[in-house]
Amino acid sequence: MTLDFRAYAQSLDLARYPRTPHLEGSRLQDGDEGHDHVPYRALAGAHLVVEEKLDGANTGISFSPAGELLLQSRGHYLAGGGRERQFGFVKTWAAAHAGWLLERLGDRYVMYGETMSKKHAVFYDALPHHFFEFDVFDRATGRFLSTPARRALLADGPVLSVPVLYEGVAPARLADLKALLGPSLAKTPDWRRAFEHTVRRQGLDLARAWQQCDKSEQSEGLYVKIETDDTTTARLKWVRHDFVQAILDSARHHSEQPFIPNL
C-alpha cells in the first residue's frame, strides 16, 4: 500500500465505534477509569439483544464515495505495516467480497465486527469464521441499525454475525441476565489441548503462553444492546471478573504478545 494512499485514507472522515459503558457488576478494565457503571434498573422495560462478547480486534469495513474499500481499527484506517498482521485474513476476505459488500454498504454504511485471527486473552478453537459482524452505522441518519435491520441489510451474503443469546424485554433481575453467561460457543471442551498444540506448532514458550491466556471455560462476558424497531439506541457490556484478572496476570498487552492464531 502506498504512502499516497495512507495519506488519502487518513484524510477521510472516520466513524469511530463508540465507547461501551459497563453494566452494574461488570469488572472495569484498564482505560475505564472515570466511567461509572450503569445500574441495571435503567434497563427496566427495554427491548434487549444480548450477544456473547467475543475477544478480538474491533474492525470497521466501509467504502469511500469513489467506491474504494476501507478497513479501520478503532481510531485509524488500516494502511499496511507489520503491526497489522492480525488483520491479514479480514483484508483478504473483504477484498474477495468487495462487490457484494459495496452493493449492500455503499458509502452510507459502516459495518463493524470482531476480527478473531489472533488470540488476545481468550483462545478459541471452534470459530466458524475469523470476522464476526456486530453493528452497522448509518452515516445518513447518524444512527446504528437494530439487529433485525442489520439482518435484513446483510441477508444472503458471506457475513457472519456474533452469537445472539437472548432477544426480548429486559429480564426482571440482573441475576437473570447474568444467567445467560456460559461456555463460549466458539470453544470446544478440548480447547486446552488445541491451545497447547498450537503454541508448540508456533515454536513458543508454553508456560508463558498459558500465563497470557484466560483459563476459564466461560465466555468473556455479555454485550447488551437496547433497541427499538430499527435503531440500536445504547449498548452496555458485562465482563466477568476473572477475565480481567487474566489480562492483568498476563503482564503484557495482547499487541505485544507473540502471534497465536485462533482456530
What role is predicted for each listed range?
Residues 2-263:
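Core nucleotide-handling region used for phosphoryl-transfer chemistry
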